[in-house]
């Protein structure tokens, strides 16, 4: 593929890792961020020590403080900013764009208040004549592993498969591989909701429960993620793929996951405000829990794990009691899709 100019909006751990993948593939990569010291560090020292202590970035990766400079003549834009600021950044991008670009995002969350998926936000804020159909880049991936070129397989989802294949082409190489998918709703809801289940899985570990309990919360978590996703229009088969069960496994079982670590601390009795302060990073699963709970209540979708996590975080319920209460819920069939 011809060399592309790509703006990566957000110099966090995942944005930095994806920037390196694109750079490895010979593309011109421009990272944009709003913390001047971090931008200077990337340009002068070729490091981003806030997230990676021992990683040296390629000197061809450039960072920008001015969004207009990062967007100048680019072929594609990759949003990797926190969910809560995606709309704000998209508005800024829309004001500056003077040509049509491919628009991608690699964030995982649902917007508080509106309950909207991130692709919907980007569609609303960036005029259709200035962008492609949105492409969602999502799947089982720890930035800490991708940045050291460990093998990673994820999904590129879009309503337009030609655009998804373009994104597949700019990213894929010997250690990083993308598969295309047309189920944007499924891929986005899977990526957002698995963070809630990861909080629960971490909490179980923090409370001292074993592998049986962790396997249970992951598999039943997948069931309720699928339940809500299908209600919203997703294909249930998507949840058996990389962006579904794959992402849930990697997030719900690893200390690399900030959502798992947050749950672990909650399970050990730490206060949420202390956890967020100590981690110093966005814990998307916390805000997503509230959004998912509200959607489930509105649509009448049964989500007991999400409800238990919600009550613990937002209503002050004891997390151990909330989780144990699920054991007395009405007995059900495992295969709710079986019509027999």
UniProtKB/Swiss-Prot annotation:
The reaction(s) this protein catalyses: sn-glycerol 3-phosphate + NAD(+) = dihydroxyacetone phosphate + NADH + H(+); sn-glycerol 3-phosphate + NADP(+) = dihydroxyacetone phosphate + NADPH + H(+)
Known EC number: 1.1.1.94
Positions of NADPH binding: 13-14, 108, 143, 258, 282, 284
Predominant localisation class: cytoplasm
Pfam families given in the database record: NAD_Gly3P_dh_C, NAD_Gly3P_dh_N
Keywords: Cytoplasm, Lipid biosynthesis, Lipid metabolism, NAD, NADP, Nucleotide-binding, Oxidoreductase, Phospholipid biosynthesis, Phospholipid metabolism
GO cellular component, one term: cytosol
Residues annotated as binding sn-glycerol 3-phosphate: 108, 139, 141, 194, 247, 257-259
Pathway: Membrane lipid metabolism; glycerophospholipid metabolism
GO molecular function (one): glycerol-3-phosphate dehydrogenase [NAD(P)+] activity
SUPFAM superfamilies assigned to the protein according to its UniProt record, in alphabetical order: 6-phosphogluconate dehydrogenase C-terminal domain-like, NAD(P)-binding Rossmann-fold domains
Stored InterPro entries: 6-PGluconate_DH-like_C_sf, 6PGD_dom2, G3P_DH_NAD-dep, G3P_DH_NAD-dep_C, G3P_DH_NAD-dep_N, NAD(P)-bd_dom_sf
Alphabetical GO biological process terms: carbohydrate metabolic process; glycerol-3-phosphate biosynthetic process; glycerol-3-phosphate catabolic process; glycerophospholipid metabolic process; phospholipid biosynthetic process
Catalytic residues of the enzyme: 194 (proton acceptor)
Location of the protein in the cell: Cytoplasm
Superkingdom, natural source: Bacteria
Family listed: Belongs to the NAD-dependent glycerol-3-phosphate dehydrogenase family.
HAMAP family per record: NAD_Glyc3P_dehydrog (MF_00394)
The protein's role, per its UniProt record: Catalyzes the reduction of the glycolytic intermediate dihydroxyacetone phosphate (DHAP) to sn-glycerol 3-phosphate (G3P), the key precursor for phospholipid synthesis.
Designated name of the protein: Glycerol-3-phosphate dehydrogenase [NAD(P)+]
Lineage: Bacteria, Bacillati, Bacillota, Bacilli, Lactobacillales
Gene: gpsA
């Amino acid at each position: 593929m011809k060399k592309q100019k790509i703006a990566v909006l957000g110099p966090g751990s995942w944005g930095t890792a994806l920037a390196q993948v694109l750079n490895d593939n010979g593309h011109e990569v421009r990272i944009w961020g709003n913390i001047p010291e971090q931008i200077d560090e990337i340009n002068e020292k070729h490091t981003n020590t806030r997230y990676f202590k021992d990683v040296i970035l390629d000197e061809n990766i450039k960072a920008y403080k001015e969004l207009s400079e990062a967007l100048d003549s680019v072929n594609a834009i990759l949003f990797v900013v926190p969910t809560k600021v995606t709309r704000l950044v998209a508005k800024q991008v829309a004001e500056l764009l003077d040509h049509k670009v491919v628009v991608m995002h690699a964030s995982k969350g649902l917007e508080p208040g509106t309950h909207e998926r991130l692709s919907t936000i980007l569609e609303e804020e960036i005029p259709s004549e200035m962008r492609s159909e949105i492409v969602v880049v999502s799947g089982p991936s720890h930035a800490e592993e991708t940045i050291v070129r460990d093998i990673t397989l994820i999904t590129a989802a879009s309503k337009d498969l030609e655009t998804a294949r373009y994104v597949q082409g700019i990213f894929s190489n010997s250690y990083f591989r993308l598969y295309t998918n047309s189920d944007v709703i499924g891929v986005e809801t899977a990526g957002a909701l698995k963070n809630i289940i990861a909080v629960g899985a971490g909490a179980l570990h923090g409370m001292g429960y074993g592998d049986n309990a962790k396997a249970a919360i992951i598999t039943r978590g997948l069931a309720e993620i699928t339940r809500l996703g299908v209600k919203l229009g997703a294909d249930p088969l998507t949840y058996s793929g990389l962006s579904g069960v794959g992402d849930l496994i990697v997030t719900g079982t690893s200390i690399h996951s900030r959502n798992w670590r947050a749950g672990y601390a909650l399970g050990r009795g730490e206060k949420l405000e202390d956890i967020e302060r100590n981690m110093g990073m966005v814990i998307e699963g916390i805000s997503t829990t509230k959004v998912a709970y509200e959607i489930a209540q509105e649509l009448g979708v049964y989500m007991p794990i999400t409800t238990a996590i919600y009550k613990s975080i937002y209503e002050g319920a004891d997390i151990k009691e909330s989780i144990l209460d699920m054991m007395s819920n009405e007995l059900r069939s495992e295969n709710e899709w079986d019509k027999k």
